Amino acid sequence: MKKPLLLIIALTATCTVSAQGYYTDAHNPDITRHTGRIAPQRMEFVLPEVNGYTAYKADLHTHTIYSDGDCTPEFRVREAWYDGLDVLAITDHVEYRRHEGKMLHFLKGYVPEGTEAFNNNVIRKTADERGIQSDLNLSVKLAQETAVKYGITIIPGAEITREPLAYGHYNALFTADNNALYDVDALQSLRNAKAQGALVMHNHPGWRRKSLEHPEFEVKAYSEGLIDGIEIMNGAEFYPKAIARAHTRKLFVSANTDIHDSAAETYRIQGHRRNMTLIFARDNSPEALREAIEAHRTLAYSFDTIAGDEQLMKDLFAASVKTKVLYTDPKNGQHTVSLTNNTSVQYVLRFPGQNPVVLKPFSAITTTVGRDKPLRFTVENMWHSEKDHPRIEVNL
């Protein structure tokens, strides 16, 4: 009798759970809706204030259907908000717009018969005398119109895109008119960007190359002072040698998605946070963000790794992780110390003579420190050069 009774109880519990999984629609009692279908929610990425500045999460390299991306500018904004971003640069290619032919075919009733796309792929060849007739400002405008509903700041931009081995790709940020960027001479395109007040970022410097050594074009671009920043990380690629270049040439550092598909496909479904450029600014206005970028108050974040200026990373860590003496052994004076991580960043710590330990977001670990000794460790998922990580010392 006991087994049938247990079965009845189990079935009753199952039915109860199933019943609780639905609710009656507030406007139509003939509809029941499942509680599992909830409103989309933003995944916050919590960071502390550092030296009085707010840490804004930015993606400075994204694409839409108006170049070779698979998503609209409006979707890019919503996606960024759900991913916890505060700042988004729309940087469609100037020289490559692979959807234009399909767009014209779709609009065949609106355009003269036989109208074909032209100069929509001039990465490896020059545009003819007709030039580029598409409105390269449209994707930025559409993103800006949507962004006001989400509190996201849009940085207008475009990617100057030439053959990757000899020339490379460069994002012009804070542009005034993307339609005025193109020139047959790639160097002149960079000059055009600078002339309208844009900051120029060197994108994925190792992409499709055998090293980060400068080809002749880059030597000229850097020597002329046309480059303001560099991607330390792009997608899943990390260029440790680029950190030293940023220090030497006084460039801001960044990490970006270079997203073409959806961020859910590339990051969320695989359990990752998307790449971010952390900008430490007084507020989220374009002026304040630009001031912070020009002052090099940026760090690169990708796949739980942070890279950039050593002192800024130390300041971020100090603001993120709090230490506390939990117990002092009265016999030998040895301290038991807790380290509490109050942020969304995961830290990999190595104490002297030990294997690395992971301090997860919003978690704490303990370690021991001898009498009258400081707490010392290295943060191994922070990089301030090709091989070096910040060394932290805390006096207890």
Language model regions located:
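Sec-dependent N-terminal signal peptides
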Residues: 4-13
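His/acidic metal-ligating clusters that form di-metal
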Residues: 199, 205, 213-216
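Charged catalytic cores and adjacent phosphate/nucleic-acid-binding surfaces used
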Residues: 20-59, 77, 168-175, 210-396
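Short, small-residue-enriched loops and turns at beta-alpha junctions
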Residues: 66, 207-211
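N-terminal signal peptide c-region/cleavage motif recognized by signal peptidases
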Residues: 14-18
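A metal-dependent hydrolase metal-coordination microenvironment
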Residues: 36-196, 203, 232-233, 237-243, ...
